[in-house]
């Protein structure tokens, strides 16, 4: 018996989904986030065709026609409330970033040995583990991310590299961290007082 060649079914392709550059949701769901206006502006610039299908006068009128008058009022109130909440959260984050400092401490371990401890990078949205690894490669020394007693993350780099770390941070992450928010601190161990005989 001869086998009949059966057509191979075409492999189904995954659908290409566009994600918003502001809130990372699909544009159809941006209205449920707090950054609807920014999302709308991003969509207008990045994908004008999709913007027309979602935010054109016809699309908005057809969506509003299905709602009752009271539902329209509630939707408008909810949208205004969400926008105000998002604006307040954004202002709070900006204020917190402006007030926070990245501290680079030079800590003495023994007589001649020092470590450099960096704190405050997580406020700027930077990954401490990645930065610790990059610092270890850059300065060819041991570098690790640890949690301090206060529960904050800190990066410990072996050696006295505090000035170099500041320069490197400004070079690599200068857009995120302003120079005025980086402070160098020298932390010396207190010498034990000897008792008088």
From Swiss-Prot:
Its main location: cytoplasm. Disulfide bonds: none annotated. Keywords: Cytoplasm, Ribonucleoprotein, Ribosomal protein. Gene3D superfamilies: SUI1-like domain (3.30.780.10). PANTHER family: DENSITY-REGULATED PROTEIN, DENSITY-REGULATED PROTEIN HOMOLOG. It is found in: Cytoplasm. CDD domains: DENR_C. It comes from the Eukaryota. One of its GO terms (cellular component) is ribonucleoprotein complex. The SUI1 domain may be involved in RNA binding. Residues 102-173 form the SUI1 domain. PROSITE patterns: SUI1 (PS50296). InterPro entries: DENR/SUI1_TIF, DENR_C, DENR_N, SUI1, SUI1_dom_sf. This is Translation machinery-associated protein 22. The keyword Cytoplasm applies. GO terms for biological process: formation of translation preinitiation complex; nuclear-transcribed mRNA catabolic process, nonsense-mediated decay; ribosome disassembly; translation reinitiation. GO terms for molecular function: mRNA binding; translation initiation factor activity. Interacts with the 40S ribosomal subunit. Belongs to the DENR family.
């Amino acid at each position: 018996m001869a086998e009949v060649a059966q057509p191979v079914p075409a492999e189904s392709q995954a659908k290409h989904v566009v994600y918003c550059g502001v809130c990372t949701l699909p544009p159809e769901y941006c209205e449920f986030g707090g950054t609807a206006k920014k999302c709308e502006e991003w969509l207008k610039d990045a994908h004008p065709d999709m913007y027309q299908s979602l935010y054109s006068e016809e699309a908005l009128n057809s969506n509003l026609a299905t709602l009752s008058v009271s539902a329209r009022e509630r939707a408008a109130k909810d949208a205004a409330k969400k926008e105000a909440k998002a604006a307040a959260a954004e202002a709070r984050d900006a204020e917190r970033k402006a007030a926070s400092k990245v501290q680079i401490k030079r800590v003495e371990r023994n007589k001649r040995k020092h470590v450099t401890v960096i704190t405050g990078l997580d406020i700027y949205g930077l990954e401490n583990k990645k930065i610790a690894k990059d610092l270890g490669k850059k300065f060819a020394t041991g570098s690790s991310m640890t949690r301090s007693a206060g529960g904050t993350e800190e990066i410990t780099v072996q050696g006295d590299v505090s000035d170099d770390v500041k320069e490197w941070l400004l070079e690599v992450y200068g857009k995120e961290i302003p120079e005025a928010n980086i402070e160098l601190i020298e932390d010396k161990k207190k010498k034990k007082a000897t008792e008088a005989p």
